[in-house]
């Protein structure tokens, strides 16, 4: 069995439904991967990276998945600061020989936030596309504004069915990644 330590905010945790109903739990249903869900609601990238670096993972964990940035944007953190956190995460994974998967930001139902999320997404792609496995699950959420409005409870957090769709979409891609 393969293990992935999944770090992030409420979008990893599965808010408001909880980890048992998150998209990471759905990945487990479709693969032979145990998804260790370390998502905590409300955290910014600096908090999440602190936890990644501070707490030792079991020796059998070789893969780290990371999703963050929405709370940073909501709290007014600058793109440079967020990218510094991602660089610290990448450097840590290199140092400890972890394979890194970065889940690209979920585009929301809020246009102001989307401007910032799209900037973050572009910067992540530019900086890490050759260094880490980048996974974009937006197809499972919806690409157009109408689909996104129907996909979210509050403009940011997916409905239960969308978490399920994200997990089903991500499962074969994550399975292929851990088998490399």
Predicted segments, located by residue:
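Catalytic His-Asp segment of secreted/periplasmic serine-dependent ester chemistry enzymes
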Residues: 14-16, 110-180
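Oxyanion-hole/transition-state-stabilizing segment in secreted/luminal serine hydrolases
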Residues: 17-20, 46-84, 102, 108
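Active-site segments of SGNH/GDSL-like serine hydrolases
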Residues: 67-70, 89-119
